[in-house]
């Protein structure tokens, strides 16, 4: 729950469980952040439930212990109590519905994202499009890490790290990697759509409602987990 350079937040949600590779990654990242920025480490949000699986609220992902939310609120050197970690909130970094960063966004935020994305264990990172465009404009030298920063809805209070499947875990299937290149043009297109939304398509078909989650739709391993409870 607490280390020298990290703290898990919102413990009452019981979503601070991850695979060993995820725990190692978060601890490693927190040390790097404390060393290379003015932050004292990182605040860790949701990872997964104790036995994985879908959650009742908040996420469609975070089901197999390889996803983690990292708050964009800079960590201080103060150790927060459990009660404080329930009440303190992260802060939004977006302006104009995510088209731009706001005045709270700093060079240290960019460094944290660079450190997070540069790790070989990372598959992709989700962040609001305005932040990606800001980093595209300011980054010089090695830009390869930008490829892993993917623009996505929300994600302006935290960024979402998704790790690659651990070696030897046959039941885990990696997503296709992000397209080649730094992905900056794609992020710019996201911003353009925010600032100048396309008109609604009068011929668009209504979205189908999401199918309910049933045990039959979950991986076979879930049956064994639930049977053991």
Predicted segment positions?
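Short secondary-structure capping micro-motifs at structural edges
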Residues: 55-59, 111-112
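Catalytic cores and adjacent binding grooves of peptidoglycan-active enzymes
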Residues: 80-229
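Extracytoplasmic
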Residues: 37-39, 63-68, 156-158
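Short, functionally critical alpha-helical segments immediately adjacent to catalytic or ligand/cofactor-binding
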Residues: 44-48, 67, 161
């Amino acid at each position: 729950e607490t280390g020298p350079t990290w703290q898990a937040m919102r413990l009452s949600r019981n979503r601070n469980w991850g695979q060993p590779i995820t725990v190692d990654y978060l601890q490693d990242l927190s040390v790097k952040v404390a060393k290379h920025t003015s932050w004292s480490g990182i605040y860790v949000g949701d990872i997964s439930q104790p036995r994985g699986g879908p959650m009742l609220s908040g996420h469609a992902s975070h089901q197999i212990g390889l996803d983690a939310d990292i708050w964009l609120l800079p960590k201080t050197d103060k150790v927060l109590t459990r009660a404080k970690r329930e009440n303190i909130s992260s802060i939004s970094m977006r302006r104009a519905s995510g088209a731009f960063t706001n005045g709270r966004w700093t060079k240290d935020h960019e460094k944290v994202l660079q450190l997070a994305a540069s790790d070989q264990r990372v598959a992709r990172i989700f962040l609001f499009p305005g932040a990606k465009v800001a980093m595209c404009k300011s980054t010089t030298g090695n830009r390869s890490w930008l490829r892993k920063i993917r623009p996505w809805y929300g994600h302006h209070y935290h960024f979402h790290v998704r790790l690659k499947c651990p070696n030897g875990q046959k039941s885990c299937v990696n997503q296709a990697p992000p397209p080649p290149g730094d992905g900056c043009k794609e992020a710019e297109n996201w911003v353009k759509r925010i600032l100048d939304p396309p008109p609604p398509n009068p011929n668009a078909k209504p979205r189908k409602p999401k199918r309910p989650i049933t045990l039959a739709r979950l991986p076979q391993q879930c049956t064994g987990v639930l049977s053991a409870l």
